[in-house]
Amino acid sequence: MKKTGLSVAVTGLAVLFFIATAYAVGNEEYKPVEKTSDTTTAYIHQIVNKDGKVLLTVDDIDWYEGAEADKVFLEREPDSGEEGTPDGYYIVNDKEELHALEVAPNAQIVMQVFDKTGKIEDVDVDWNQAVTLTEFQEIFMNNKIVDVSQYPFHLTVQDGKVVKIIQQYLP
């Protein structure tokens, strides 16, 4: 009887350990992208391959979050009846102006939400998933379940080329 009780206790602890470990691995917290002089935020409208180069057609936006988002929101929408932004972020895009940016072949690309399996029930936030440029192009074109063109992206541009692309998570 003591062996059975011990076995049940050990099994229970093992199950709790695995659940806690699995939760900890997938429970990375959101961290805002640091604003730098070489980073802009934009919607990506198109990705094309031209003359051996990958080009993004983008529309730059102003991205705000936290207290800064609340401040800009209240300045721009004083009659909203709200005390701040509903979701903690605010996007300003006063004029849509598309322009092209070349992507460096070795650009670092980081995604938060995209279709990995073709099943809507599998779509979930998976923080900071690195993908290759080829994978990113495939993700962008595969818009049946998750249309990533509807997400802002933080683009780091150095020497005229995009060297880093980070998908902005939207709650």
Name the predicted role of every residue range:
Residues A24-P171:
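Solvent-exposed hydroxyl-ligand-binding patches built from regularly spaced Ser/Thr
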Residues M1-V25:
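Sec-dependent N-terminal signal peptides of Gram-positive bacterial secreted proteins and lipoproteins
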